[in-house]
A protein has these predicted regions:
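Extracytoplasmic/secreted proteins, especially bacterial periplasmic and envelope-associated proteins
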Residues: 42, 58, 91, 95, ...
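Structural recognition of the beta-strand scaffold that forms the well-ordered cores
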Residues: 55-60, 82-87, 112-117, 152-157, ...
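Short, glycine/acidic-enriched loop or turn micro-motifs at the edges of active sites
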Residues: 64, 90, 196
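Oxyanion-hole/transition-state-stabilizing segment in secreted/luminal serine hydrolases
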Residues: 65-79, 93-138, 143, 154, ...
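Proline-centered flexible-loop/turn and helix-kink motifs
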Residues: 79, 149-150, 185
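Catalytic His-Asp segment of secreted/periplasmic serine-dependent ester chemistry enzymes
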Residues: 160-237
Length: 237
């Protein structure tokens, strides 16, 4: 995600990164895939059929996308809020951004949007810097704030991945989370780091929670729900 897509406000928010490195040209325009187009069309029809009647928006990748099928019981907790799940497997920040800029936020007025995105930026490209992934997350937050000014955003830390705390990807995830935490304003953007909830006291990510070291199973989704439900209840008031 190139820095040229960030507004001065977002750049100021990420002031801790004095000069974001020039990124590879991973722009929304070059992020489109056949899968994206197909799922995007499905989402647009879903929005039209429901006449935009959704109170809760979920934005993310396969981790978000898989919740309804992998843990129906926990996902059912959102039913009273009429959720719209905009997760797509494998997506990076620039692909999510393309979708949000091309209609998926139009005609809806959710009370809360929960955003968890960025792990595929870090996992799919070994040279992807945390600053680049954070810039993509920042642009997504900015886009939601612009298109849905009355919607509160619950921005989550990128979930831990890989079993051991010493694994290299863990450090990059942590560095990215440290950056996106700066987007918290305590009013319309609430940042919540729930990393510890998934880990043992020693920092291990067990197969009992994420069998492949990335995607939650039913137990992992229960942990996710327990970690965010009180905050969501407050934001939904």
């Amino acid at each position: 995600m190139s820095c040229r897509f960030l507004s001065p406000i977002i750049l100021a928010t990420l002031a801790g990164v004095a000069a974001l490195p020039a990124a590879e040209p991973r722009t929304p325009e070059t992020a489109v895939t056949p899968v994206l187009i197909t799922r995007h069309s499905t989402f647009m029809k879903q929005i039209a059929d429901a006449k935009g009647d959704f109170d809760f928006l979920l934005v993310g990748d396969s981790i978000t996308d898989g919740w309804p099928s992998k843990s129906k019981e926990t996902y059912a907790a959102f039913a009273p809020w009429k959720p719209l799940n905009l997760g797509i497997s494998g997506e990076r920040t620039e692909q999510v951004l393309w979708r949000l800029l091309n209609g998926e936020l139009d005609g809806i007025h959710p009370k809360v949007a929960m955003v968890m995105i960025g792990t595929n930026n870090l996992g799919h490209a070994a040279d992807e810097k945390p600053e680049w992934a954070a810039a993509g997350v920042a642009k997504i937050v900015e886009t939601i704030r612009t298109k849905l000014p009355n919607t509160k955003i619950l921005l989550l830390s990128i979930f831990p991945r890989s079993e051991k705390p010493t694994d290299g990807i863990r450090a990059r995830v942590t560095a990215t989370n440290d950056l996106i935490a700066k987007l918290h304003d305590g009013k319309m953007v609430i940042y919540k780091d729930i990393t510890a909830a998934f880990l043992t006291p020693e920092g291990v990510l067990t197969k009992e929670v994420m069998p492949d070291g990335l995607h939650p199973n039913a137990k992992g989704y229960q942990i996710w729900l327990d970690a965010v439900k009180p905050t969501l209840d407050e934001l939904m008031k």
